[in-house]
Amino acid sequence: MSYFNTNETFFVIPLNSSDGEIRKINCLFDILEKSGVGEIIESANYKSSNIGRKAYNPYKLFAAIIYCFAMHKGTLRNIEEMCAYDLRLQYILNQNTPSYKTILEFINDVVLPNKEAIFSKITKTIIDEFNLDIDDCYLDGTKLEANANKYK
C-alpha cells in the first residue's frame, strides 16, 4: 500500500530550483515508503472518529513535519507558517494548512509514543539506500578519537 504519494497535479510557480526541490520531496516520500513508517502511523489510529472536521492525511502531515525539521524549522509556529506559505509544503500537503495545534496533537499522539520505532526504521532505510558505512562515528566532520586533546 502506498502511503506517501502525491496523486494530484499541482501548479507550481516556475522557479529555477523547483525541479530539484520536487525531486528531494519525492526522495523523502520514497524513503518514508520503503521504511514502513506508514504502518506505524496507521497503527496509531490518529483522528479515527468521523465526528467533526475531516482529519488531515497523517502520512503527509508526518512527511511535512520531517521536511520542516530537515529545513531547520523546528518550532510549531514555524512549521505552521511554512505549511501556509511555502510551496514545497503545499505540494506535500496538497494545499492543506494545518494549525500549530493540529501539528502539536499529531506529534504528541503519533510521533512521540512511537519515536524509537519510527526513526530507527528511517535510519536503517537511509543506511541501506545510500550504502552508508556507520562503523566510524563523525561529528561535524571531525573523527572522534579516544585520546583527543591529550598532549604527551
Predicted regions and their residues:
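Short, aromatic/basic-rich helix-turn unit that serves as a nucleic-acid recognition element
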Residues: 69
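Hydrophobic alpha-helical membrane-insertion signals
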Residues: 1-26
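DNA-recognition alpha helix
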Residues: 78-91
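Short amphipathic alpha-helical "interface-anchor" segments enriched in bulky aromatics
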Residues: 28-32, 83, 139
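Basic, short loop/linker segments at the boundary and entry of helix-turn-helix/winged-helix-like folds
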Residues: 20-66
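Hydrophobic alpha-helical scaffolding
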Residues: 14-18, 54, 112
